[in-house]
Amino acid sequence: MRICYLGPPGRQARLQAFAGPETEVIARKMVGGPESVESVYEEFLSAALLMDEVVALEREGFDAVIPGCFGDPGVDGARELVRIPVIGPGLAGMMTACLLGHRYGIVAPLEGDVRPTETLAIHHGYDQKLAGVRPLGVAVLEMNSDPAETLEQLAGVSRSLIEQCRADVIVLGCGTLSFRAEELQAAIGVPVVNPLRAAIKLCETLVSSSLSHSKRSYPMPPKLVAVASRGAR
């Protein structure tokens, strides 16, 4: 099984460690994409690039694709274009959290990420169990500048979600933050979901079960069907 992760460079080994022995995870950077996604504008930029990427990846023989952003930019559109699973970390993280507790909280990078994250939960149908979304207050590109300080801040925000919002589970709402999940879980004593790991495991489950998204939900755009039909004549 081959899964392509489209996101920031330098994550190949860590992502591969999350996968099973029969799975190969290939990490690639989307050419022309933003260095980080911290606004709706940047989500739209990433979404447009994802469309071309997924078609090429399916032709290349990949079994599943994971866009490397918690906001799941472009996932719905990409599913219309291909038949292989396209799994967003946001969806995978929220779904996993709902299996582990009655209410879950999300730690987002910045204040500006809170509303889009809440909207994402509504879009995926996981808003009923969402206890709250709180910002870490650290930009994505600065999260690794002081790992100890970032972990301390993560623990503080997570505890506020647990104590004030009654969250039973914490989801790390950023791909860069996701690699701190095990440390944070040890520090705060509740399950902490790494959305990238959850996405890889969900891809493995779907592919090994010969399942993918329904084309009744995500049909090929009619204009593209018409073009393909003309080309086949």
Residue ranges and their predicted role:
Residues 4, 173-179, 191-220, 224:
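C-terminal and late-domain segments of enzyme folds
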Residues 39-56, 149-157:
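Glycine-rich, highly charged phosphate/nucleotide-binding loops
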Residues 50-77, 81, 174-178:
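Beta-alpha junction/loop-to-helix N-cap segments that form part of ligand/metal-binding clefts
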Residues 58-61, 122, 162-163:
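Non-catalytic positions within long, well-ordered alpha-helices that form the structural scaffold/packing
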Residues 67, 71-74, 155-187, 200:
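Hydrophobic alpha-helical
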Residues 1-48, 109-147:
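N-terminal glycine-rich anion-binding loop in soluble enzyme alpha/beta folds
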Residues 98-136, 152, 205-233:
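Short, glycine-/small-residue-rich phosphate/pyrophosphate-handling segment
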Residues 79-100, 184-203:
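Short, acidic/small-residue loops that bind anionic groups at enzyme active sites
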